[in-house]
Amino acid sequence: MLTQAPKGTKDILPSEVYKWHYIEKEIAKLCHDFGYKEIRIPVFEHTELFQRGVGDTTDIVQKEMYTFLDKGQRSITLRPEGTAGVVRSYIENGMASLPQPVKLYYNITAYRYENVQKGRYREFHQFGVEAFGAPGPSIDVEIISMVKLFFDRLGIKEISLNINSIGCPVCRAEYNKKLMDYLRPNLSKLCATCNTRFERNPLRIIDCKEESCKKITANAPALVENLCDDCKNHFEGLKAGLENLGIDYKIDKNIVRGLDYYTKTVFEFVSDNIGAQGTVCGGGRYDGLVEACGGKPTPGIGFAMGLERLLMVMENQGIKFPESKKPDIFIAAIGDKANSYAEKMVYELRKEGLSAEKDLMGKSLKAQMKYADKLGAKYSIALGDDEIESGKAVLKNMETGEQKEISLDTLISRLKM
């Protein structure tokens, strides 16, 4: 067990990490283009933050959090998502005094004790954005368009946008009465978890993944059809904004998202390329969350996407990733004098911003050239006593095989051409 990664975790090896570098670079560019600034939050927070923020009736809080007592007997939890930590930081650091909206993004690892399956891990990578202070549907449209543009830039096809509105506390209270009246005759057929949710948070039953519960809720009254005027107008504004940008969408009355903090707009981007639970990105508005966590009433909206699932979609669709940069040159050296000269030359090349490699294992010249080929070096040079004495060597283009004698003094300028 000592030499095996814990269940639900995965090493990202050098042969794969270039794909992550590409996605991370595209994330940074996207967020820059939309005016979002990066925030870095702690890996762990006080457990109460997630109980209050995520919701103590959610699967995440009830079943999936990694929670422990620290040496001071404080209850600490590894972050299961990013929003609650960003909200805490927004409050603690007085960001309400900044020009609004405050637009933030993060690229983090998160931790949930989930059933491990393809694309779902217990340690996973999550990219998310949060925007605070804008109450109208325009920011909802911007957030959704941001995800759409990101997928377009990555070349992802066959991904659909589903939207819904789950209202505000006012219309949700009225809706909950209707939902409870509908569910009450079927309580015995609901799973044990949903039976506990019936009184505390009946809306959460709509989100249950158990087949028996899904059958019962399939014909339940839809919250989107029971909105108050304010929520209805907000949803109409969202739809009009998406249509104005030419973004296709479908209304899915069953989207409630798995977190209690959502209000009004909720949305998911779904792909058929990763199995039954094909959500790649999800998000929505949370107008009461900042206040619930101890701040002033502040509207907010955000999204999060799992990067493991994003990678699965890209690979399943055959999308090519730009390969990692190969060494500009490999310097092969034979003999102590040549090796010493090569060490200095490699250092000088690296100081100039060039990627240079040399043998560190005492291999033969033939083995060194084979190694240079495996590294994918663009050029190679072989050094021995004769080359050092003359100050000249043969520069070989490893792709074409073309060879040309050059002065060693001009090597840096030639490689920079």
Curated annotation (Swiss-Prot):
Catalyzed chemical reaction(s): tRNA(His) + L-histidine + ATP = L-histidyl-tRNA(His) + AMP + diphosphate + H(+)
Under InterPro entries, the record lists: aa-tRNA-synth_II, aa-tRNA-synth_II/BPL/LPL, Anticodon-bd, Anticodon-bd_dom_sf, His-tRNA-ligase, HisRS-like_core, HisRS/HisZ, HisRS_anticodon
Cellular component annotations (GO), alphabetically ordered: cytoplasm
Q: Cite the entry's keywords alphabetically.
A: Aminoacyl-tRNA synthetase, ATP-binding, Cytoplasm, Ligase, Nucleotide-binding, Protein biosynthesis
Q: Which residues form a coiled coil?
A: none
Q: Which Gene3D superfamilies match?
A: Anticodon-binding domain, Bira Bifunctional Protein, Domain 2
E.C. number: 6.1.1.21
Q: Does the keyword tRNA-binding apply?
A: no
**GO terms under biological process:** histidyl-tRNA aminoacylation
Q: Name one GO molecular function term.
A: transferase activity
Q: What class of enzyme is it?
A: ligase
Provide an example Pfam family for this protein: tRNA-synt_His
Q: Where in the cell is it found?
A: Cytoplasm
**Tell me, how does this one assemble?**
Homodimer.
Q: Which family does it belong to?
A: Belongs to the class-II aminoacyl-tRNA synthetase family.
Q: What is this protein called?
A: Histidine--tRNA ligase
Native species of this protein?
Acetivibrio thermocellus (strain ATCC 27405 / DSM 1237 / JCM 9322 / NBRC 103400 / NCIMB 10682 / NRRL B-4536 / VPI 7372) (Clostridium thermocellum)
